[in-house]
Amino acid sequence: MTETQSSQDVSTKLERIAKLAKDKPGVSLLTLAHHIDVNWLREAYRRTRKDGARGVDGQSAEQYAAQLDENLQSLLERAKSGRYRAPPVRRMHIPKGDGKETRPIGIPTFEDKVLQRAVAMVIGEVYEQEFYDFSYGFRPGRSAHQALQAIQNASWRMKGGWLVEVDIKKFFDTVDHAHLREILHRRIGDGVLLRLIGKWLNAGVIEGLVLSYPDEGTPQGGVISPLLANIYLHDVLDDWFVRDVQPALARRAVMVRYADDFVVLFETKQDAERFLAVLPKRFGKYGLTLHPDKTRLVPFQRPDRVGDDDDGPGTFDLLGFTHFWAVSRKGHWIVKQQTAKGRFSRALRRLREWCRWHRHDPLKAQYLTLKKKLEGHYAYYGITSNFDRLAAFFYMAKRAWRTALARRSQQRMPWWKMQKLLERFPLPAPRIVHRYGT
């Protein structure tokens, strides 16, 4: 079977799973694992990143691919027979959005990533029929930029209001295993899949030379972790919000969620305060805690609607952007979004460090990497109202490169000389990639 035929075979099976889930809402589906065969695993392998960090066994994607057919056949037999053993994940820490704290992530082995992808493809298709439209994180055909646009559109339609900004404290580390299993059992009754998920939840964590076995959490870094997080929050938050919260409100409210980051915009302050009062109790039932310093009520009325006794409008940060009211070029009130100060500073610090550490590399190699870094920055932060911040980052990037090259030569580098260099190696200028809300 060719690669194209294999992909088509998987697509057909995904359609069958979706239809089954639609036809049997609320039913625990017992027979799903039979869809996973060697072709399915091959498609899962194709969808798995090949340049990611290595797990505890040190095996690279290239090494695994050297005997791909044999490895996939062996993986299938072990997964179906129950002999598969989930290896420990390798824990490492990366900076969080503000750059002041770190976020622990767990790196599975490459083979474990492939199997996690295969299982996620099955159960993800089931839950895609249930997830709400206001959930944007780690879902096919959805993105952070769609979430940003949804915030902008909701604010415009409702003329602002009162916004609840929420931060769940160490969400991925505190997901309660018992509650997650209970939630999964309502829709997934297949023993093979549930057994594999249980093995991943119970897999050890290696940090340094220490092996531990956490009794809660689903490590970030795993392929299946974002899906499990979405399933958990769909039940704990999304479904509760739609079924219980919204019907009890006096006026409208809109939620926008991207994984564990979410905000809720209310038309009235009273509704927002009631929601903020009951949310900790709801989360507490499922082992989740709100960060007291980062969860707050933000007055976010459109400026021309702010009363004399109101504090607004305020600002809030979400998905790396600061959101605030401003006047558009056409003279209308809109919500603009600009790179958050913490994200800007962290990105610039990383770029400066890279320039300093790689200043002795060949100029062309430096240029190609810097070009890629700038293009990546524009690809995410290049939205309509953010051009000034892009331009500032571009200018500071040129300064950082100039400073590093001056250290390399141990001579001053005037701007005219830097301009000559940039004529040879032109860094990409700022550009808007995502246009909306003008």
Which sequence ranges carry the predicted segments?
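Non-catalytic terminal/accessory segments
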Residues: 1-438
